[in-house]
């Protein structure tokens, strides 16, 4: 999906594009194929890698307009497996679970958002008009039974996006998350994809088109966006939105309604301005 977005941006001559990837060979080849595109190695689970990439970009261009936090992996081990023991007296703790999906899919997004806000705010526009789009998943809205760690990370992305969006928006930065259904990427192998309903796959070009609409503030640019149900969000409301994408269209997904007014008051009190000097250090 990241490649599809890069290709779509490369067709618009006013974009300088940076691709970050852990696969140096693939990233370098892609950068050669696309105009105005630079590759920078980065393991998104390592803050120093991401910081170096952002710094290199900013030193070269002096501004940042859009960031697509898209890198992701899924767990390859069975969370539900139970190692066998000779008898109940020989039972030992199981090996520590492998957590690459938590590290890449959630921690990597947190690092990316943290760096994005810094360089957005140091750009000439001081953040106004900046766009950060995060890749969550349908597994961030519904339980993904065979990949609970991936699902936990993607639920985390949606919650993280909603939590930062208001404060980012105060600086003019729009933060949104896409929650696609199944898209044939390298997330799983062909046997894995074959276990899903064959008629429900989404083309990567569909994802890229929606991402660019979020970046542009709608279609036409700046006019807001209308989902498949006909619900329209004007530009000034097009932030903090989780956009679910299926093979049939895309849908704005609201956060849960408050159980009562008391809970609304509690959560309203968490705005950053209330907590600086209280819970937060200045």
UniProtKB/Swiss-Prot annotation:
The disulfide bonds in this chain are: none
Which InterPro entries does the annotation name?
NAD(P)-bd_dom_sf, Sc_DH/Rdtase_CS, SDR_fam
Task: Write out the pathway annotation from the protein's UniProt entry.
Answer: Sesquiterpene biosynthesis
Q: Which Pfam families match?
A: adh_short
- Coiled-coil residues are none
Enzyme class name: oxidoreductase
What SUPFAM superfamilies does its record include? NAD(P)-binding Rossmann-fold domains
| Signals that turn on the gene | Expression and the subsequent production of PR-toxin take place under static culture conditions (oxygen limited), whereas no expression of the PR-toxin genes occurs under the strongly aerated conditions required for optimal penicillin production. There is a negative control of the transcription of the PR-toxin genes by the penicillin biosynthesis gene product(s), or by a regulatory peptide encoded by a small ORF inside the penicillin gene cluster.
Question: Per the UniProt record, which EC number(s) apply here?
Answer: 1.1.99.-
Keyword NADP included in the entry's annotation:
yes
PROSITE patterns, per database record: ADH_SHORT
**A cellular component term, taken from the record's GO annotations:** cytoplasm
Residues forming the catalytic site:
150, 154
Q: Record-annotated residues binding NADP(+)?
A: 23, 70, 150, 154, 183, 185
A Gene Ontology biological process term: secondary metabolite biosynthetic process
Q: Name one GO molecular function term.
A: oxidoreductase activity, acting on the CH-OH group of donors, NAD or NADP as acceptor
Q: Which UniProt keywords apply?
A: NADP, Oxidoreductase
Against PANTHER family, the record matches this protein to: 15-HYDROXYPROSTAGLANDIN DEHYDROGENASE [NAD(+)]
Q: Could you tell me what this protein does?
A: Short-chain dehydrogenase/reductase; part of the gene cluster that mediates the biosynthesis of PR-toxin, a bicyclic sesquiterpene belonging to the eremophilane class and acting as a mycotoxin. The first step of the pathway is catalyzed by the aristolochene synthase which performs the cyclization of trans,trans-farnesyl diphosphate (FPP) to the bicyclic sesquiterpene aristolochene. Following the formation of aristolochene, the non-oxygenated aristolochene is converted to the trioxygenated intermediate eremofortin B, via 7-epi-neopetasone.
Give the family from UniProt: Belongs to the short-chain dehydrogenases/reductases (SDR) family.
User: What name appears for this protein in its UniProt entry?
Assistant: Short-chain dehydrogenase/reductase prx7
List the top taxonomic levels of the source.
Answer: Eukaryota, Fungi, Dikarya, Ascomycota, Pezizomycotina
């Amino acid at each position: 999906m990241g490649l599809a977005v890069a290709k779509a941006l490369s067709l618009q001559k006013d974009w300088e594009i940076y691709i970050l990837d852990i696969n140096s060979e693939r990233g370098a080849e892609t950068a050669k194929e696309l105009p105005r595109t630079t590759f920078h190695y980065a393991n998104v689970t390592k803050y120093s890698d991401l910081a170096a990439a952002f710094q290199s970009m900013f030193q070269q261009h002096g501004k940042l307009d859009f960031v697509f936090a898209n890198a992701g992996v899924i767990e390859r081990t069975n969370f539900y497996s139970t190692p066998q023991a000779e008898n109940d007296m020989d039972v030992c703790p199981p090996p520590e679970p492998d957590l690459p999906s938590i590290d890449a899919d959630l921690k990597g997004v947190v690092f990316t958002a943290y760096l994005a806000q810094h360089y957005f705010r140091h750009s000439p526009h001081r953040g106004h008009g900046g766009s950060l789009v995060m890749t969550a998943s349908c597994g961030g809205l519904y339980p993904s039974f065979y990949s609970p760690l991936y699902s936990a990370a993607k639920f985390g992305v949606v919650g993280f996006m909603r939590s930062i969006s208001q404060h980012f928006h105060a600086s003019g930065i729009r933060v949104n998350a896409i929650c696609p259904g199944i898209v044939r990427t390298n997330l799983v192998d062909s046997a894995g994809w074959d276990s899903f309903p064959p008629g429900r796959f989404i083309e990567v070009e569909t994802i890229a088109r929606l991402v660019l609409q979020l970046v542009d503030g709608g279609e036409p640019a700046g006019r807001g966006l209308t989902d498949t149900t006909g619900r329209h969000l004007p530009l000034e409301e097009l932030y903090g939105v989780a956009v679910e994408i299926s093979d049939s269209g895309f849908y704005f997904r609201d956060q849960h309604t408050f159980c009562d007014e008391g809970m609304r008051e509690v959560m309203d009190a968490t705005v950053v301005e209330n907590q600086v000097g209280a819970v937060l250090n200045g």
